[in-house]
A protein has these predicted regions:
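Periplasmic/cell-envelope proteins involved in peptidoglycan metabolism and beta-lactam response
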Residues: 1-177, 201, 285-295
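Beta-lactam-recognizing serine transpeptidase/beta-lactamase-like catalytic domain environment
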Residues: 102-115, 147, 155-207, 211-335
Length: 335
């Protein structure tokens, strides 16, 4: 559906011609009265990186046109990433030219010599917190790998690097090959269009140990001087992958990333006060632990951010474990 269609108004017949095609058409254009070539701007990406951050632009569809009267057939808009988040800021404002037409709708010239015309306004420049050098290094590190890297400025919370691998060259989704290239990305079994930095769910790994220590101190079930034994690879039920002395206090547990220390710490948090066989008290302690962990933002989407398409993490509830293991069938080691 082409709103504003008129047989006397310019209509797009074909677009995104290359130089060779333009030259060929110029030679034959005299045979086709009414055919003209017009130049328009097209998105250009300086670096072949940061595809999941930048996103892409694509031609608007019927729903876009119905939703926003800014668009007409042939316009482009941001489809994902920063391109979509800041579409209204980046697109600027269209210019206006008023023409006089005859009874058949044919243009007769500008109205009042164009004094009511309005010039187009360029979109706003957008400055990201991404550090291009760091982004390039991170993408090189993730070449031929699957996963993500995110680097954040601690003082401000700004994202300086965000990589999801595999990714693609954002320039591939510009121009006449966009549809074919996009379909190729859709069909790729490694799902390069998925932003693993914001949409995948991963276990936090050893970075979680520092948070675990803070929660234990807040719960006052241990002190920083509380020690637990570590027998290295012979430890049970959790083995240690580092070579260090025993017993281990909190400082050394963090420094050595000692698995047995943090297993014992977590066990005592949930079974404190001698409630090892009291599942009511055990679950109360689990709920307290879960609430504190959630207060750090785990299991939640980021708020007040321009990072799109986030998937929330998951902090299992008591009901989750009860359903899988039964009401008395799970312990600290299960978690």
């Amino acid at each position: 559906k082409n709103r504003g269609y008129s047989r006397y108004s310019p209509q797009i017949f074909i677009q995104n011609l290359n130089q060779e095609e333009i030259a060929q058409l110029q030679q034959e254009k005299y045979k086709y009265p009414g055919v003209d070539i017009r130049i328009r701007t097209l998105r250009d990406y300086t670096y072949p990186i940061a595809s999941h951050i930048l996103g892409s632009v694509g031609e608007v569809n019927y729903h876009d046109i119905e939703k926003d009267d800014y668009y007409v057939v042939g316009d482009y808009s941001g489809r994902d990433g920063i391109e979509r988040t800041y579409e209204k800021e980046l697109r600027g404002k269209k210019g206006v030219e008023i023409f006089m037409r005859d009874s058949r709708g044919r243009v007769q010239g500008p109205y009042r010599q164009g004094e009511l015309d309005l010039p187009a306004q360029a979109g706003t420049d957008l400055h990201l917190s991404i550090d291009i050098a760091t982004q390039q290094i991170a993408e090189q590190l993730m070449h031929n790998k699957v996963g993500s890297i995110v680097a954040i400025e601690p003082q401000t919370g700004e994202i300086i690097t965000m990589v999801s691998a595999p990714n693609w060259n954002p320039g591939k989704l510009v121009g006449k090959e966009r549809s074919a290239n996009y379909q190729q990305l859709l069909d790729d079994p490694q799902k390069p269009l998925m932003n693993r930095a914001t949409q995948a769910q991963y276990s936090p790994g050893s970075t979680f140990k520092v948070l675990q220590a803070l929660v234990a101190l807040q719960a006052k079930c241990v002190t920083s001087h509380t020690q637990y034994p570590c027998n290295g690879k012979s430890s049970s039920p959790i083995k240690c992958t580092h070579d260090h002395g025993s017993p281990v206090d909190m400082e050394e547990g963090i420094e050595q990333s000692c698995n047995p220390y943090f297993w014992a710490l977590y066990r005592d948090m949930l079974q404190q006060d001698g409630y090892q066989d009291n599942h009511i008290a055990f679950k109360q302690h689990y709920n307290q632990w879960r609430e504190i962990i959630a207060s750090f933002g785990l299991g939640k989407r980021f708020e007040d951010t321009d990072v799109r398409d986030q998937a929330a993490g998951y902090l299992p509830t008591i009901q989750f474990y009860d359903k899988i293991y039964g009401q008395r069938g799970w312990k600290a080691i299960t978690i």
